[in-house]
Regions:
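Acidic, Ser/Thr- and proline-rich intrinsically disordered linker/docking segments
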Residues: 2-19, 32-35, 39-94
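Broad, structure-driven detector of short, well-ordered beta-strand segments within folded domains
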Residues: 22-28
């Protein structure tokens, strides 16, 4: 039996997000977030996993990640359980 091969478009995690974050997705090489702008528009933001050095903390439904620039990336998910699932999926690919 052969192992399943993951390409860079295999979806590992998806959540509807909360607040400004409308859609949060984890792929094997990146995190994609659909954010709501201040004037009602939406734009996609991509954070590559090679730039993430680890998870700083989980506070409620917010996940704080450390990146190579020593700044925090914050992702607001729909619930605390989804935040923990986000971190578990992130640890699986890092």
């Amino acid at each position: 039996m052969r192992a399943m091969r993951m390409d860079n478009n295999t979806l590992l995690f998806q959540d509807k997000g909360s607040g400004r974050f409308k859609d949060v997705k984890i792929y094997p090489n990146r995190i994609e977030v659909l954010k709501k702008g201040t004037f009602g528009g939406k734009h996609a933001e991509i954070v590559y996993l090679k730039d993430i050095t680890g998870v700083n903390r989980i506070k409620g439904r917010d996940v704080f990640l450390r990146n190579r620039l020593l700044t925090a990336c914050v992702f607001s998910l729909s619930s605390r359980a989804k935040a923990q699932e986000f971190v578990n999926a992130l640890n699986m690919v890092m």
